[in-house]
């Protein structure tokens, strides 16, 4: 009887694993054909060669870019170089990327920046918040931006026991922000198992000096996060579920679900067009090529625009798509006055005029 029970349990476990493997294969399918779509006047940005995972543009047109991310399972073209924060002034006729110096006292060799977000205080001081993975840990670094000379002053490192596998961040007040956890586990083996079994254990966190709490959960892999222009709604990308969750923000910072927009492609970082309120999504049309990188058959890039996301019928259109011949592994797109920057996990960055 004991052997029969053991065999039954083993058989059920293998059947479940087989079903989950098929589901995983479907979620990271490489079967999609990419129809090239490119605005006029696009060119690669000189100096950004090792990723540009996230981009945040100030109302003034200054764009902050996080580069050099080393992420488990992803390629890296400069594994021994620390990450950097770059700046571009999109008001210039020919914007160039400038690496920002960081004040003494911060271990720049440990900088491994992921998602970033800016906050402008009442006195117009600009603060940059960056998810950092020093030694594959997760922290949030707070910097003050200095206009003259353009540089960053490190103010604070935020750590918390809930800050595991943090991906992206959106800041809504002084030391008040939402952050996403893209995995529940942190060890490579358990992360792989989590990706296959897909238990939907990832979440959105809220942080303030007074409290840290989980405000939304049940995502396959919570990734990019941003807010509507009126800051009443929070947009969360569930990357492996291929959708965007729209959530209502309450006075106590809790989030409640409103709707889900299905996109049929893996959704990474999100930004909002300041002129229209449209969502821009950096996407991965063939993610298996990210996991198994072949420079002869690289992963493609895709940027989607979601118009009227709060309406009953949001309109989804493609702003940019490429099979990897120009841009590989797009993660983010951000716009300012008809100028668009597209970033990637480990590859280059693109400047386009819309």
UniProtKB/Swiss-Prot annotation:
SUPFAM superfamilies noted in UniProt: Calcium-dependent phosphotriesterase (SSF63829)
Which InterPro entries does this UniProt record tie to the protein? 6-blade_b-propeller_TolB-like, Arylesterase, Paraoxonase2, Serum_paraoxonase/arylesterase
Cysteines joined through disulfide linkages: 42-352
The record places the active site at 114 (proton acceptor)
Q: Name one GO cellular component term.
A: extracellular space
State the organism named in the record.
Rattus norvegicus
Keyword Calcium listed? The answer is: yes
Q: Belongs to which family?
A: Belongs to the paraoxonase family.
What protein name does the entry list?
Serum paraoxonase/lactonase 3
Q: How is it modified after translation?
A: Glycosylated. The signal sequence is not cleaved.
What EC number(s) is this enzyme filed under?
A: 3.1.1.2, 3.1.1.81, 3.1.8.1
The residues the record assigns to binding Ca(2+) 1 are 53, 167, 223, 268-269
Q: What is its main location?
A: secreted
Gene field:
Pon3
Q: What class of enzyme is it?
A: hydrolase
Query: Mind listing the GO biological process terms from this record?
Result: carboxylic acid catabolic process; coumarin catabolic process; establishment of localization in cell; lactone catabolic process; negative regulation of superoxide anion generation; phenylacetate catabolic process; regulation of cellular response to drug; renal sodium ion transport
């Amino acid at each position: 009887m004991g052997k029969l029970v053991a065999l039954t349990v083993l058989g059920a476990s293998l059947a479940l694993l087989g079903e989950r493997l098929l589901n995983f294969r479907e979620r990271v399918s490489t079967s999609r054909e990419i129809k090239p779509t490119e605005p006029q006047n696009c060119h690669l940005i000189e100096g950004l060669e090792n990723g540009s995972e996230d981009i945040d543009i100030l109302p003034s047109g200054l764009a902050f870019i996080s580069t050099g991310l080393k992420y488990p399972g992803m390629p890296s073209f400069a594994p021994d170089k620390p990450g950097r924060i770059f700046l571009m002034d999109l008001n210039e006729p020919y914007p160039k990327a400038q690496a920002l110096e960081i004040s003494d006292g911060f271990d720049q060799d440990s900088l491994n920046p992921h998602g970033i977000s800016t906050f402008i205080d009442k006195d117009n001081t600009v603060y940059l918040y960056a998810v950092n993975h020093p030694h594959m840990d997760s922290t949030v670094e707070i910097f003050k931006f200095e206009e003259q000379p353009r540089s960053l002053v490190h103010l604070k490192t935020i750590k918390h026991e809930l800050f595991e596998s943090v991906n992206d961040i959106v800041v809504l007040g002084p030391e008040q922000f939402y952050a996403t956890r893209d995995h529940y586990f942190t060890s490579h083996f358990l992360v792989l198992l989590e990706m296959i079994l897909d238990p939907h254990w990832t979440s959105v966190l809220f942080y303030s000096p007074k409290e840290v709490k989980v405000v939304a959960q049940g995502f396959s892999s919570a990734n990019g996060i941003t807010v509507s222009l009126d800051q009443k709604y929070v947009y969360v990308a569930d990357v492996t579920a291929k959708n965007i969750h729209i959530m209502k923000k309450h006075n106590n910072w809790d989030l409640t679900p409103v709707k889900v927009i299905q996109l049929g492609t893996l959704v990474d970082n999100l930004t909002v067009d300041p002129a229209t309120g449209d969502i821009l999504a950096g996407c991965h049309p063939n993610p298996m090529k990210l996991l198994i990188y072949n420079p002869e058959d690289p992963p493609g890039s895709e940027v989607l625009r979601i118009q009227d996301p709060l309406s009953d019928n949001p309109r989804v259109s493609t702003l940019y798509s490429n099979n990897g011949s120009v841009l590989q592994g797009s993660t983010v797109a951000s716009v300012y006055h008809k100028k668009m920057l597209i970033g990637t996990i480990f590859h280059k960055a693109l400047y386009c005029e819309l």
